[in-house]
Each structure stands twice: as structure tokens, then as C-alpha cells.
Amino acid sequence: MEPILLTDREEYQFVTDRGFCPLLDYKRFTMDIRLRVEIQRELFGHCVFGRGNIPQANVRFFRWIWEHKPHQCEETLRPLSSYSAVYCSHILTRGSHPEMAHDPRNINILCFEMHNRWENGDREKMRIYPGNVRIIELLKNEYGSLRI
């Protein structure tokens, strides 16, 4: 089934009012990248391109992620009992891709050990690697179109 394209605020509001989360659910919904960035700025702060209060935006973003994703490590499937920003692991790092830092699709929920493995280890051997490669391609294509 093809994902549903959301092009304006009314469509976004329509699906969120019905319990869907199009910022995360990229398999069901595709959002116009400009709409996505606009909504992310409103939810988390005006720091998508390096402006604004980045630490406060990070706190809002990580809390939002924790509220909207299952509380288990995506690699080991172990439950994670309480909130910690350490569990929010960027697929593409904030330093190399600051424009994607507050895109919920760019986050895996990982326990501390798996977060370190993704950042510093042999990520190619991780269970989440193939899915993350697809997400990386999707993110780079969408955000690349913003620069045109």
C-alpha cells in the first residue's frame, strides 16, 4: 500500500486527530518536507537550521520521542523502565546533519550499550542496521530537496 501524502496543515491535523502520528509513521504517511520542518519547528523549537535555543529544543524533542515510541530497546527488545535522553539515539548524527536533528524518523530508542555500539561500534552487524539504511536514504533525499 502506498503511503498517504500530507501536503498541508489541515490534512496533518485530520490524521493526528484520529490518533495517527505522521511525523513518525513514514510507512503510512508521507509529508511534504516543508510542512514537516514547519511542524517540527513548532513542536520542538526554531533550531532546525541552527537558530534558537537548541538545548531546550532537544529536551522537548527527546521527551516527545519518549512519549510517542515504545519504551524498549529497538536492538535488544529489552524494556526501558524510565525516561533518559541517552535512550534517544540519532541514526544520522546531529553534528553532521543538524537539519535532521529533530526529525523523529532519525531516532532509534536504544539502551545505553546499544547506543554506544551504534555510535562507536560495528553498526553493520546490528539488527536495526538494514532499516536504518532505508531511513538514511529517505532522510537524505527529502532534506536534500530543501536545498534546491
What do these predicted ranges mean?
Residues 2-12, 18, 25-72, 99-101:
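Short, charged surface segments at domain edges that flank catalytic/cofactor-binding sites
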Residues 21, 73-76, 111-114:
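Short cysteine clusters
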Residues 64-65, 76, 125, 139:
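Broad structural signal for hydrophobic residues in well-ordered alpha-helices, predominantly aliphatic
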Residues 5, 29, 55, 87, ...:
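Intrinsic disorder/low-complexity signature
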Residues 74-109:
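Histidine-centered nuclease catalytic patch
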Residues 95-109, 113-148:
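Polybasic, low-complexity binding patches
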Residues 12-13, 108:
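Ordered hydrophobic segments in well-structured contexts
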Residues 3-4, 21, 137, 144:
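Intrinsic-disorder/low-complexity peptide segments enriched for small residues
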